[in-house]
Swiss-Prot record:
A Gene Ontology BP annotation from the UniProt entry: regulation of DNA-templated transcription
UniProt GO molecular function: DNA-binding transcription activator activity, RNA polymerase II-specific; sequence-specific DNA binding
Residue numbers carrying Phosphothreonine: T325
Miscellaneous comment text of the record: Present with 521 molecules/cell in log phase SD medium.
UniProt name for this protein: Transcription factor MBP1
SUBUNIT field: Component of the transcription complex MCB-binding factor (MBF) composed of SWI6 and MBP1. Interacts with MSA1.
Amino acid sequence: MSNQIYSARYSGVDVYEFIHSTGSIMKRKKDDWVNATHILKAANFAKAKRTRILEKEVLKETHEKVQGGFGKYQGTWVPLNIAKQLAEKFSVYDQLKPLFDFTQTDGSASPPPAPKHHHASKVDRKKAIRSASTSAIMETKRNNKKAEENQFQSSKILGNPTAAPRKRGRPVGSTRGSRRKLGVNLQRSQSDMGFPRPAIPNSSISTTQLPSIRSTMGPQSPTLGILEEERHDSRQQQPQQNNSAQFKEIDLEDGLSSDVEPSQQLQQVFNQNTGFVPQQQSSLIQTQQTESMATSVSSSPSLPTSPGDFADSNPFEERFPGGGTSPIISMIPRYPVTSRPQTSDINDKVNKYLSKLVDYFISNEMKSNKSLPQVLLHPPPHSAPYIDAPIDPELHTAFHWACSMGNLPIAEALYEAGTSIRSTNSQGQTPLMRSSLFHNSYTRRTFPRIFQLLHETVFDIDSQSQTVIHHIVKRKSTTPSAVYYLDVVLSKIKDFSPQYRIELLLNTQDKNGDTALHIASKNGDVVFFNTLVKMGALTTISNKEGLTANEIMNQQYEQMMIQNGTNQHVNSSNTDLNIHVNTNNIETKNDVNSMVIMSPVSPSDYITYPSQIATNISRNIPNVVNSMKQMASIYNDLHEQHDNEIKSLQKTLKSISKTKIQVSLKTLEVLKESSKDENGEAQTNDDFEILSRLQEQNTKKLRKRLIRYKRLIKQKLEYRQTVLLNKLIEDETQATTNNTVEKDNNTLERLELAQELTMLQLQRKNKLSSLVKKFEDNAKIHKYRRIIREGTEMNIEEVDSSLDVILQTLIANNNKNKGAEQIITISNANSHA
């Protein structure tokens, strides 16, 4: 077995390496320490099991953990005796005995070096790959060159001496990296970019799915893949390039393998779609485009623009005069009418479906909310991009109509069919914008789901650079649907967008420089104004007129105050004026001109200042008033609580008095019994003396108790009032420190205020004393209760609740007595007569 032991050096350490079926087992030459991890590997333990064994049995002994360096040398090293014990325990001692027993005597030959284990480095792999790729490229170049020579010779034989050798590849300046970079940019929409609006040229919008190229070339054309991949790159070419542009050798890894050059007709279509116009053909193409635009009305039935005539179509420039930033334009073919494909089967199916959809939208079934035809819920498969064709003169798509109508089933069906959520009408408005302009999604309660489908377009802008927030705010907060839409948008946008993007959306300026906050200010809309400010809209942005939202709101407030002052004089004679009061504002509608006037709840709702802090303080005045009202309510509750406590104390005093009287009576009875002599005669003089003494003692005790109770009541009242006064002083102090108040150094005024404060304190003490006296002075009332108790045989506790009944009984008895007296008087008079 000694032939299995070798010499090796790992991480600068000389070791003996024993070759085992599970791997190498190492022992250090300098101290005969053995790698315990290798022993556990020889015992066929898994890594997790090895770790547990090392922790329980090895690490508590003498050991050395080696981490880093050569991988095979790493592990937990232990002395030879511990290694032998470990091997014996796990039944591998016999297998590793040659390594344990091996010793090298002085002068003896060292074991042979361990066999080399080849580990290919990264440099070697790169060199191998580079050499293989170079050889493959050179071989491909030689094959391509031979094929070109053969093709050139065949062209001469066929009688085409001018045919140039064809080269495979893309024009100079177009690389695979540039195409990839462009592809990334094309996938980014306006909603993925920050504001301001990026300048994306129309020629850079992807049109890789256009039916024109596919149907024109057909499946037999071998250059379709080249054109579709090179279309973006060729847009970077200069128009001055010749039609026979210079080509360079193509990289084999880009996947393009066609050696066929595009035909002249196909090259012309390609140049027209990509904007690559050679100098020799520029005038010809312009002439063809002019002729095609003149005959574009009936040239293609694939792009309908109205529900009545789906066969009508216009050139792209006429169909989308204003288009916004949404990339729906990329889904509509960008080519002149002459190069449009002929009608296909899928085109006809989509046109029929759109026709049925328009008929349903304008029918009474839609208005009456009848059951939806099932055929409308199943658009033709593979209908994109035909499904995004305009269906009315304003270039709305079917998806625009479905979202505007709030018809969620149709909207979801079109969404699943692949319709573009960023399709725009003639004003550049997206389906989300159109949905927010009507109340249908509000009445049907479908706007949250529609917004969920279209949430990616919430940052898109139309041709006027207005967002969906602009469109909602223009409808004013007096419209319930507008309030509902804004609440949904602002609440759900937080789920997928950071705060800075929300603020960018709210502060987006249109072509007039107006943000949504400017529009709310122009409308005098306090509700929307405050909502947008709370969400992060800035009040300091100036529009093109140089006005901020604050300034516009102040102007609206001034006009409102003037108009309200005029209306107070005219209101008595104006019978056509209807006033509708809302919870937050007053809406005044004039039946003559439908003029809407919003008057504020208070001036602080409208007044704004150049300082944002001053504006916030002004608007917090209602909060201060509400806090004072809450404080008054709390004080009132405490007052009622104190009254209840005082009443309970009075009841306690009454019960104590009653007990005192009963005890006194019992005491007198006992004293009378004990003061009788043997003959049963009472000693009256002694009785009176004893009774008087007892009464004096009881009176003194009761007075002391009364004084103590009075003191307790007064202390409680003073303590509660002190707490309230301290709280009021603290609130006033905080309010004084928060608001910058000029210091008044007028000593005389301070003295007057101090004198007034002293008077108020004295008044408070006097009122407190009078309040305690009122509770104390109940002797007469108690006597009245005792009189009633003696006359009615009722308990004193029941007297207060029975006063009304007793009074009515006495009145009734009095009336009966008077009637009896009158009867007696009459009978006496008759008897005398």
